[in-house]
A protein has these predicted regions:
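Residue patterns forming the tRNA-binding/recognition surfaces of aminoacyl-tRNA synthetases
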Residues: 87-198
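NTP-handling and nucleic-acid-processing catalytic cores
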Residues: 2-109, 113-114
Length: 198
């Protein structure tokens, strides 16, 4: 969600990310640390059930809009390599998984979406706020709705050559054999002249 970039407080990489492979060469102890991530059950079905564990690495990222702000980078067991790029930014105030991770590792929780347009000075969140609202604490996005902020931030990232608009579909394979039994029928016409038509 590009609208929540001002609330980013960490970057998380999949243990299978190519940057992690490069780090293993320079940091021999990293392999031992990676074993602690308990990667046995990290598939899409189990990812919400497992304990979120991370390894902080000695690199930092520069915030795309705040050049003087650096963001710590972790290797985390809840980031999957086969979805997107295998790297995500964490916005703890607006994603429960990120919120839990930030609490565990004592990271900043910066509220950037609120029901009201007013700026919030103190963070009193007890859980992530995941509803829509207005952008706050977000520089040039302040006062915009979530949808407006998404559009503005994507355009700014494209203008700065830091990103581009993309859509990732999460479609799963599914069989049609039970479609008639479980759901809407699949229209098939049996024509004596032309054969089966779908």
């Amino acid at each position: 969600r590009p609208d929540t970039l001002f609330g980013a407080s960490f970057i998380a990489l999949s243990p299978d990310h190519k940057l992690v492979d490069k780090l293993k060469k320079n940091y021999p102890n990293l392999n031992k640390e990676l074993n602690k991530l308990n990667l046995k059950n990290t598939n899409e079905q189990n990812i919400d059930k497992i304990e979120k564990i991370g390894i902080k690495i000695p690199l930092k990222a520069t915030h795309p809009f705040l050049k003087n702000k650096t963001i710590p980078i972790f290797i985390a067991n809840f980031v999957l390599i086969d979805y997107g790029t295998g790297a995500v930014f964490g916005c703890p105030a607006h994603d429960q998984r990120d919120f839990d991770f930030a609490k565990k590792y004592d990271l900043d929780i910066i509220e950037v979406v609120s029901q009201e347009k007013k700026q919030v000075r103190e963070n009193k969140l007890r859980k992530a706020y995941t509803d829509n609202g207005y952008l706050i604490n977000s520089d040039f996005l302040n006062g915009l709705t979530v949808d407006e902020a998404k559009e503005v931030s994507i355009k700014k990232l494209e203008k700065l050559n830091l990103g581009s608009r993309t859509i990732n579909y999460r479609l799963k394979d599914w069989g049609v054999s039970r479609q008639r039994y479980w759901g809407c029928p699949i229209p098939i016409i049996y024509c004596k002249k032309c054969g089966i038509q779908t």
